[in-house]
Design a protein with these regions (language model features):
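Gly/Ala-rich beta-loop-alpha elbow adjacent to hydrolase catalytic centers
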Residues: 430-437
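Actinobacteria-biased recognition of intrinsically disordered, low-complexity terminal regions
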Residues: 1-72
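Conformational gate/switch positions in structured elements
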Residues: 2-5, 435, 523
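C-terminal His-loop and adjacent cap/lid subdomain of alpha/beta-hydrolase
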Residues: 70-426, 446-613
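Short glycine-enriched nucleophile-adjacent loop
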Residues: 437-448
Length: 613
């Protein structure tokens, strides 16, 4: 029996009770024992004298009845009409486009989360309205539920269809061909499961709150008990998430990726040249480099490869790297890497690149390969590992390690570099991608600190990067957030694709060049907790070239959409999302300023980098 039928049955019982006479003892004049007992009772206050007294049973039947309390199981599954309207509206808004294409599984996840948020907002709105209206909750009529079901059917179908159209447009914009219709079909089921799970968790927390409040009410007042209960439950939720669940997740991730760090990628072999760490004469054993360190050291273009591209005599590039197992802390790793770099002759090369890795210790091969090709092999690159966790986990746990590693490595290199005679110093460059740019920035206090180098290249900077945010927030009036202009581009500039130009066009860019590469569709660049409650400029202003013009900001919804984009930011073709492989050729060319390369040469190098990547 559904809830509407139960309410109708209750009304029938009320009508039957109205026709029943009261007990004989409740009728005036029928009490035995004399006139005193049989005399009519005084009329209640507000009731005219002589008016017939309403029997208690009838009065009870005619009085407004509160909604019947369901059983414990039904209470867990019980939903309110205002909450359902909120879930419907907010859930349907989740189909609006975000930065990247998403399959049915991710759409179902976002749908379920946002619907649960909408349900909570609907319940909260109804509670506030009742508080101002000074009325109790009432069961909705059958026709109200009927109207909701009809509206839900229409809205879900329309939203689902529009969502598929928008996803098609995004895939077309980025050149994504993969599409699994099965995932789309199961998305409503996933959404329902996520919604029910969140709803049950919320009901469980509500039950815990009530139990704590009742327990405390034995010793303190009701209002105080409720307030303390809220504090207790909120604190418990925080401790469980930040303590038990978070640390448990990190420990499991550490255990899993620490094992992976001991492996070596297929096709990578220990270097046989003394110009690489882990090779003959190196101070750093091959086994201590870690998986990504061995990949960085064991790959890259040879002198012959570079000569084929430049058609000039080339040098064998130098690479130095220290893994987590190479030393006990970041400072020791940096000192060891610089010692090995000096042994290899890195400070005698014309160009020296300091790279801060991503969370896993990864150095984008497109970055270093482009640097080595464009410098004719007269280059040395040094880096250290500070974690073996992927960047999306390192965002949560390794931000301080990234800053420490970036500062330690640059300080160690700069300390040795500054001891050389000015005429014998290599040109010093700094680079980093994603969390590596966050760590790379840590060694500098601002644009003038960065200008100590010959050039800087950061790709896909996270939104929380200190200097990136400073430059973007103080951009020149009229420049959009997706491509800001800072102080007329005197030192710092931003570009989506350097091959198409680095604004502002026509302005001088002398001395040190600091270039940030960022795609309008890169969720790493734009994700921020502020998306929950405030609209960012990159949405309110004109969109970038690979973002749909129909994207707009919705409280709560946009935050979860961009959050869901993060793990898949590298799963799109180059030139979009968090994939910068082909942009590194033109980025390095912009910062290095090597002579003699034509646009055809750069196009040829982009093909080489794409092939080798």
């Amino acid at each position: 029996m559904n809830l509407v039928d139960e309410v109708a049955k209750g009304r029938d019982l009320q009508e039957q009770a109205t026709d029943m006479p009261g007990p004989p003892a409740d009728r005036p004049g029928e009490h035995p024992g004399g006139a005193g007992q049989g005399a009519a009772r005084p009329a209640p206050a507000g009731q005219p004298a002589g008016a017939a007294e309403v029997p208690p049973a009838v009065a009870a039947a005619e009085a407004p009845r509160p909604p019947a309390k369901p059983g414990k199981l039904r209470e867990l599954l019980y939903v309110t009409l205002p909450g359902c309207w909120g879930a419907l509206i907010v859930g349907c808004l989740s189909f609006t486009p975000s930065l990247l294409p998403r399959d049915g599984i991710i759409q179902g996840l976002i749908w379920g989360i946002t619907a649960a948020i909408g349900y909570g907002l609907g319940v909260l709105a109804a509670w506030i309205w009742r508080a101002f209206a000074d009325r109790d909750a009432r069961h909705p009529r059958r026709r109200s539920w009927t109207a909701f079901l009809i509206g839900a059917a229409v809205l879900v179908v329309v939203s689902f269809g529009l969502g598929q159209y928008w996803q098609y447009q995004i895939r077309k914009l980025m050149g994504v061909t993969g599409y699994n219709i099965a995932f789309v079909v199961v998305s409503p089921l996933i959404a329902a499961l996520i919604f029910c799970l969140i709803l049950l968790i919320g009901r469980g927390l509500r039950g815990l709150y009530r139990w704590v409040a009742q327990l405390l009410h034995r010793w303190i007042g009701q209002r105080a008990a409720r307030a303390v209960a809220w504090i207790v439950v909120a604190g418990l939720v925080y401790l469980v998430n930040a303590g038990l669940l978070f640390h448990g997740f990190v420990n499991v991730a550490n255990a899993a990726f620490s094992v992976r760090n001991t492996t070596t990628p297929a096709g990578v072999h220990q270097s046989t040249t003394s110009l690489r760490s882990g090779g003959p004469g190196s101070f750093i054993p091959w086994a201590t480099l870690g998986r990504q360190g061995r990949s960085f050291i064991g790959t890259g273009p040879s002198a012959d490869d570079i000569e084929k591209f430049t058609r000039h005599r080339a040098m064998e590039p130098i690479r130095a790297y220290a893994g987590l197992a190479s030393a006990t802390d970041a400072q020791s790793q940096a000192a060891l890497a610089v010692q090995d770099l000096q042994r290899e002759g890195g400070f005698q090369r014309k160009n020296l690149l300091v790279v801060t890795t991503t969370g896993s210790g990864w150095v984008d091969p497109a970055l270093v390969d482009s640097f080595e090709y464009l410098s004719g092999g007269d280059a040395a690159t040094v880096s250290i590992q500070y974690s073996y966790l992927p960047s999306w986990i390192s965002y949560l746990v390794d931000q301080s390690k990234a800053r420490e590693a970036g500062t330690a490595l640059f300080d160690a290199v700069y300390g040795r570099w500054s001891q050389l005679p000015p005429g014998q110093r290599p040109r010093l460059f700094v680079a980093g991608e994603s969390l590596g740019s966050f760590g790379g920035e840590a060694a500098f206090s601002g644009e003038y600190g960065l200008s100590l180098t010959a050039g800087t290249l950061f790709a896909g900077p996270p939104n929380f990067n200190t200097l990136f945010r400073e430059f973007s927030d103080h951009r020149d009036p009229g420049s959009p957030e997706v491509q800001p202009v800072f102080q007329d581009g005197r030192i710092v500039r931003f570009a989506d694709d350097p091959s198409t130009g680095v604004p502002p066009a026509g302005q001088p860019w002398q001395g040190s060049r600091i270039l940030y590469m960022m795609h309008p569709s890169d969720p790493v660049v734009w994700w921020s907790p502020h998306l929950i409650f405030s609209e960012p400029g990159w949405i309110s202003q004109r969109p970038g070239q690979d973002v749909l013009a129909g994207m707009f900001w919705i409280p709560f919804v946009t935050f979860w959409q961009v959050t869901a984009d993060l793990p898949f930011s590298t799963g799109v073709p180059p030139g979009h999302g968090h994939t910068y492989s082909t942009e590194y050729v033109d980025g390095c060319n912009t910062v290095l300023r090597p002579p003699g390369f034509t646009s055809e040469d750069l196009a040829s190098l982009r093909k080489i980098i794409t092939r080798d990547g």
